[in-house]
Amino acid sequence: MIKQKKKIIKITKKKFPKGIVHIKTTYNNVLVSVSDPKGNVIAWSSSGACGFKSSKKATPLATKTTTAIAVKKAIEQGLQKVEINISGPGTGRETALKCVQSLGLRISCIRDVTPLPHNGCRPSKRRRI
């Protein structure tokens, strides 16, 4: 009879000294995700997941809370230096930057990656109220 060896699996948390903070602000919501330089997501948060509902999800307070939660999760995993990618036209973009700075992370660069058309598709008709 063959004896099988028991495999012992060690679970270790990886340390991520560098990372990228992706902040997407829309007119209705805020999404924040923190990834390593390769693009693998370490931590994320959204204003809906933080407990804000309906039109309150797009406020600067919601942006600050959402950013703080996502970045604190990443700091627990050893994050120290970040690049910031901001996209979208929503409110609270500056609030998110101040929040990342206040949490003690070193910011290496800030990029605005909002997609802008070079006169591509025709926009939808104007809203009349």
UniProtKB/Swiss-Prot annotation:
GO molecular function: rRNA binding; structural constituent of ribosome
Gene3D superfamilies named in the record: Ribosomal protein S11
Main localization of the protein described in the UniProt heading: plastid
Protein's GO biological process: translation
Alphabetized PROSITE patterns for the sequence: RIBOSOMAL_S11 (PS00054)
InterPro entries xrefs: Ribosomal_uS11, Ribosomal_uS11_bac-type, Ribosomal_uS11_CS, Ribosomal_uS11_sf
Subcellular location: Plastid, Chloroplast
Key words of the record: Chloroplast, Plastid, Ribonucleoprotein, Ribosomal protein, RNA-binding, rRNA-binding
Pfam families, A to Z: Ribosomal_S11 (PF00411)
Record's keyword annotation contains Plastid: yes
GO CC entries: chloroplast; ribonucleoprotein complex; ribosome
Entry superkingdom: Eukaryota
UniProt xrefs under HAMAP family: Ribosomal_uS11
Subunit structure: Part of the 30S ribosomal subunit.
Family: Belongs to the universal ribosomal protein uS11 family.
Name of the protein: Small ribosomal subunit protein uS11c
